[in-house]
């Protein structure tokens, strides 16, 4: 999609069709932007290492960095960071933070980070020419505008047409029941107009579609099959992104601000509320120096298994999830979604885990879906290459691979559910789901793991 959009727009501007560049093994070095500088000896040493280290693009599209650079870990005030081909990542695991009356948690993301690097540094493949930047800027500006519009509407409490439709159904059901109860759901309809809901939906559509196009265009810089292939530019973007974040991390830590997490395009910090304006001024100064723009998101709590798997809860109750904590959708197979729901309800409102699980009567939330290579079999019944199951009290065993006979992982206690039933099953093993959710509490560091008992070796008889 991304390449097709860019090809069409470039043809409109230049009347030339794009040809794929020749692919050869190539060695290149990072080019340092003028604003980039560090203050500590540790980061200056790493900076020098990056500048002297060659990157190699192989003919199969793989990009390699030197072993010295790949193995380098950066330790700053108790947090460890690792550079990579794709982006910077902190190395935290099983840790949680909460905001309180004294301290706040703020996530600062760079607006359209990689696209901004491309535009700020004027990067384009030689085979395409500078017109690419014109096309790219139009796409980026449209997405940023839609994102700002969406944020403005969210602040007003707008949730979109799907939410409005849900409320209309609730009102209709209450009216049918002749209930004398007050309809709290009508308040939304009184405050938010239909046009605002439609604007919200339009902004989401533009944001999501252009995100796919823009990210896809960046990804094509590393694809040998694309007319956009330019591995040196891909590294220029990702290394600039990592070093720029390290610059800001260094400034935060030198100012006594604790960085609790960092990923490809953002940094999460925890600090005293009394210092918020001071920190905001520090970030504004950094924005002026680097020509990047940051967006702030405040959290009441952040609960991490690691940098790529976490739950973040905002003060208004909105929840951001990533990785294993994200509910199943078109991009991710469902896997006991009720456990994540129970965990989030516990973190947000203190709702007992078992209460959430037992109250749910949607069997889809108890289901795991998994691709089984070569097909799976359960109690002599062939299930096919995609297995769907829940955990029950009268399981007949495990699901096994047809070819090898080996057990499909995590199928102990399972009951296949290849067709969704009309009624909720009576044999759901609630205890399994409760224990699974309690394990998630250990994954995010809220509950200590039991100590590992080492087995003592019996002394051999002489």
Describe the predicted segments one by one.
Residues 1-116, 243, 247-287, 292-302, ...:
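Conserved "right-hand" nucleotidyltransferase catalytic core of DNA-directed polymerases
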Residues 15, 53, 69-70, 82, ...:
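C-terminal, non-catalytic extensions of nucleic-acid polymerases
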Residues 75-247, 253-255, 270:
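Helical catalytic core of nucleic-acid polymerases
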Residues 19-21, 57, 65, 82, ...:
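Intrinsically disordered, low-complexity, compositionally biased regions/tails
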Residues 50, 57, 174-181, 448:
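Short, flexible helical or helix-coil boundary motifs
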Residues 9, 140, 454-457:
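Intrinsically disordered, low-complexity regions enriched in serine, threonine, proline
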């Amino acid at each position: 999609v991304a390449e097709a959009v860019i090809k069409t727009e470039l043809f409109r501007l230049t009347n030339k069709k794009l040809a794929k560049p020749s692919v050869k093994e190539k060695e290149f070095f990072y080019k340092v932007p003028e604003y980039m500088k560090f203050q500590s000896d540790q980061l200056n040493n790493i900076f020098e290492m990056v500048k002297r280290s060659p990157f190699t693009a192989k003919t199969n599209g793989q990009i390699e960095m030197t072993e010295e650079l790949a193995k380098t870990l950066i330790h700053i005030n108790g947090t460890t960071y690792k550079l990579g081909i794709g982006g910077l990542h902190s190395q935290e695991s099983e840790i949680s933070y909460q905001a309180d009356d004294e301290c706040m948690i703020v996530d600062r993301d760079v607006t359209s980070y990689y696209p901004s690097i491309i535009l700020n540094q004027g990067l384009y493949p030689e085979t395409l020419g500078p017109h690419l930047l014109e096309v790219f800027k139009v796409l980026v500006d449209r997405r940023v505008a839609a994102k700002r519009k969406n944020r403005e509407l969210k602040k007003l409490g707008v949730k979109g047409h799907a939410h409005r439709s849900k409320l209309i159904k609730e009102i209709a059901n209450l009216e049918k029941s002749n209930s004398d109860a007050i309809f709290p759901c009508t308040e939304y309809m009184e405050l938010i107009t239909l046009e605002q809901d439609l604007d919200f939906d339009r902004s989401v559509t533009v944001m999501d579609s252009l995100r796919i196009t823009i990210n896809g265009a960046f990804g094509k810089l590393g694809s040998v099959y694309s007319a956009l292939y330019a591995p040196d530019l891909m590294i220029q973007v990702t290394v600039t992104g990592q070093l720029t974040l390290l610059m800001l991390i260094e400034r935060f830590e030198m100012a006594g601000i604790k960085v609790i997490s960092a990923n490809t395009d953002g940094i999460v910090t925890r600090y005293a509320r009394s210092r918020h304006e001071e920190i905001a001024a520090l970030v504004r100064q950094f924005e002026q120096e680097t020509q990047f723009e940051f967006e702030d998101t405040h959290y009441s709590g952040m609960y991490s298994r690691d940098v790529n798997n976490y739950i973040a809860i905002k003060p208004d109750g909105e929840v951001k999830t990533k990785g294993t904590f994200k509910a199943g959708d078109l991009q991710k197979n469902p896997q006991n979604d009720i456990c994540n729901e129970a965990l989030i309800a516990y973190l947000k409102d203190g709702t007992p885990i078992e209460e959430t699980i037992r109250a749910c009567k949607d069997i889809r939330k108890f289901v795991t879906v998994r691709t089984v290579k070569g097909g799976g079999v359960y109690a002599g019944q062939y299930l096919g290459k995609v297995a769907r199951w829940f955990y029950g009290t009268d399981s007949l065993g495990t699901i096994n691979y047809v070819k090898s006979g080996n057990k499909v992982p995590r199928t102990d206690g399972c009951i296949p559910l290849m067709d969704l039933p009309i009624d909720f099953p009576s044999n759901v093993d609630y205890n399994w789901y409760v224990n699974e959710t309690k394990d998630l509490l250990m994954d995010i560091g809220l509950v200590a793991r039991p100590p590992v008992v080492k087995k003592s070796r019996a002394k051999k008889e002489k």
